[in-house]
């Protein structure tokens, strides 16, 4: 019997990678920082709507970067299927 708990979903950070993964159907959900540029917010939200991907807003780019385990701010990230 395995003693491991449920695995955390894999996060991929960054606009370019996130857009690609949403378009090819590999993203299960997307997170967008509320303080991201309006063009980015609108672009990713529309991609998610068109491709049936759940889209949530994160508080800040800094917090999203921390959530992704990176040392820089992050405007967008996705979880993989």
Language-model features: where?
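Ribosome large-subunit tunnel/peptidyl-transferase-proximal elements
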Residues: 1-26, 37
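Short, flexible micro-motifs
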Residues: 17, 28, 68, 72
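Short beta->alpha linker loops
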Residues: 35-36, 59
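Aromatic/hydrophobic pocket-lining residues that form π-stacking "cages" and hydrophobic walls in ligand
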Residues: 44
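Short basic, glycine-rich beta-strand/loop surfaces that mediate nucleic-acid
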Residues: 50-81
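Hydrophobic/aromatic ligand-binding patch that stacks against planar heteroaromatic rings
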Residues: 47
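Alpha-helical transmembrane segments of helical membrane proteins, especially in multi-pass transport
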Residues: 31-32
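Short, glycine/polar-rich helix-capping loops at beta-to-alpha or helix-loop-helix junctions
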Residues: 40-41
């Amino acid at each position: 019997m395995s003693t491991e708990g449920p695995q955390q979903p894999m996060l991929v950070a960054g606009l370019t990678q996130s857009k690609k993964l949403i378009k090819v159907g590999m993203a299960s959900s997307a997170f967008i920082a509320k303080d991201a540029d309006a063009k980015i917010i609108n672009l990713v939200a529309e991609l998610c709507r068109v491709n049936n991907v759940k889209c949530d807003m994160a508080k800040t780019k800094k917090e999203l970067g921390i959530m992704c385990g990176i040392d820089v701010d992050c405007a967008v990230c996705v979880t993989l299927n």
